[in-house]
Amino acid sequence: MRIEQELKLGFKDVLFRPKRSTLKSRSQVNLTRDFTFKHSGRQWSGVPVIAANMDSVGSFAMAKALAEHGVMTAVHKHYTVEDWAEFANTADKATLNNVMVSTGTSEADFQKTKDIMAISDEFIFICIDIANGYSEHLVEYVQRVRAAFPDKVISAGNVVTGDMCEELILAGADIVKVGIGPGSVCTTRVKTGVGYPQLSAIIECGDAAHGLGGMIIGDGGCSCAGDVAKAFGGGADFVMLGGMLAGHEESGGEVIEQDGKQFMKFYGMSSKSAMDKHSGGVAGYRAAEGKTVLLPFRGSVHGTIQDILGGVRSTCTYVGAAKLKELTKRTTFIRVQEQENNVFGKE
């Protein structure tokens, strides 16, 4: 047993230090990034925010809506191959280029991924997603998928430390997904005692990945636009959002009416709700590691994504970053014990 003494930080522990800026307006800030990925050699241009691959977030409808903003969607893995074929026939090229095909690591998952990727050459992203990215099986699976799809962009995770980040990149991942337990409907840290404060995980994994020419996705922990900006400032190349994009008409969640008001069900992908729906219940050897909540129905996602991107643009103006790419270079975090003034409630 050993104890690491260094304090690790989450988004709530810091604020940006403002800096002198020549920018006159948020409209001058360019949030588009141009990436060339390490293994596939693929190029991609867009706003590096990703809707999470959760049942009630990463839907085909969400993908079509967010593509209008240049934003990506990691489509959840529970659509059938036939569903994907129909989607490919109804979506434009920009939408297809901005979706990630999510998969687990079983033999059935591998075959399904091959079937989906064969539908359209416009599918360029594969998201290999398991809860515990420290499994040797994941490394082997990444190698297998890389061999099968040498020209596709592969994301793999989730991990929170630089050593495993490096191992996944060396195995063939272009992007590593970073985050264990920070999500709004995740209870892994409570059920297992395992986790890592998300900002420190992003800083450390970003440093490791960038040293090898890889990239990272900061997955989870964002509750407001300021947190998204902090993730980018800490070195995330992409930021994945679940709860912030849940509850919208495009989210694909179950709508429930109570007392004349509409709510949408939102749950973690290791929750009892998810396992009841997809796995025939919680297996006898495991515990559910997610919550199920009812969110007030929020209407269209377009207003929400504009608000998030507007907040990030505003961050850039405060620190003098004309491009999102410059934000991490312009970032100085100050440690704090307060965030917003809650006299009139939380924003």
Curated annotation (Swiss-Prot):
What SUPFAM superfamilies does the entry give? Inosine monophosphate dehydrogenase (IMPDH)
Q: Which Pfam families match?
A: IMPDH (PF00478)
GO MF entry, a single one: GMP reductase activity
Q: Record's SMART domains?
A: IMPDH
Which reaction does this chain catalyze?
IMP + NH4(+) + NADP(+) = GMP + NADPH + 2 H(+)
Residues bound to NADP(+) are 108-131, 216-239
Question: Looking at the keywords, is Metal-binding present?
Answer: yes
Which cellular component terms (GO) are annotated to the entry?
cytosol; GMP reductase complex
Provide the top EC class: oxidoreductase
The biological processes this protein is annotated with in GO are: purine nucleotide metabolic process
Q: Which residues form the active site?
A: C186 (thioimidate intermediate)
| Residues holding K(+) | G181, G183
- Presence of keyword Nuclease: no
Annotated keywords: Metal-binding, NADP, Oxidoreductase, Potassium
Give the EC number.
1.7.1.7
- Extract the Gene3D superfamilies matched here: Aldolase class I
Which HAMAP family does this entry report, sorted A to Z? GMP_reduct_type1
Per its database record, what is this protein's job?
A: Catalyzes the irreversible NADPH-dependent deamination of GMP to IMP. It functions in the conversion of nucleobase, nucleoside and nucleotide derivatives of G to A nucleotides, and in maintaining the intracellular balance of A and G nucleotides.
Could you give the subunit structure recorded for this chain? Homotetramer.
Protein family per UniProt: Belongs to the IMPDH/GMPR family. GuaC type 1 subfamily.
Q: What NCBIfam families does its record include?
A: GMP_reduct_1 (TIGR01305), PRK05096.1 (NF003470)
Q: What is the protein named?
A: GMP reductase
Whichever gene encodes this chain, its name is: guaC
